[in-house]
Amino acid sequence: EKLYVVLKKLYNCSNSQYPTLVFYEFHKADARAVVDGTGEKETAWEVILNGFCKAGFAVNAVWPMRNAPYMRNADGTRALIVARKVSKTEQITRRGFIQVLKRELPQKLDRLLSAGVDDWDKEIACMGSGLSIFTRYQKIVNADGSYTSIHDALQLIYQEIKEYFDRIAAEQSEDHTILEE
């Protein structure tokens, strides 16, 4: 709740013409808890994203930051959350959201990865691309009339990102097979 108060104050003093930047320490364990559904409570990642959404921000990107030496066994990645003050009025169904993800996310990921993101940072950077789609809507309505939680949205985004990378791996495997023949 305190984080929401801070983010709401930040929203109120933000200008929609300029992005709002917030540094955050993203932990891979948070991502695993969301993907696996193993978390019994909200992860820190979900809490901060909920705060951004509730305050009214749209997340434009999440950029990994290299301001410390790379440590192979480190669980965390420093990240810059780039958000913008917007007036969100549009709602979409969960099915519609999934269709938008399937249509727009691959193009966003193609652009992102062409910039040369490190393997270590791909997860968080790709997540930012998915969040830019999720946070453009005021609400995402489930079939039963309830609203999609940030937890569920993150799972859907991770699923689409995984499918994207699986597709790339399959294409590369086919290319390699053709070259060998």
Residue ranges with predicted function:
Residues 1-181:
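S-adenosyl-L-methionine-dependent nucleic acid methyltransferase catalytic domains
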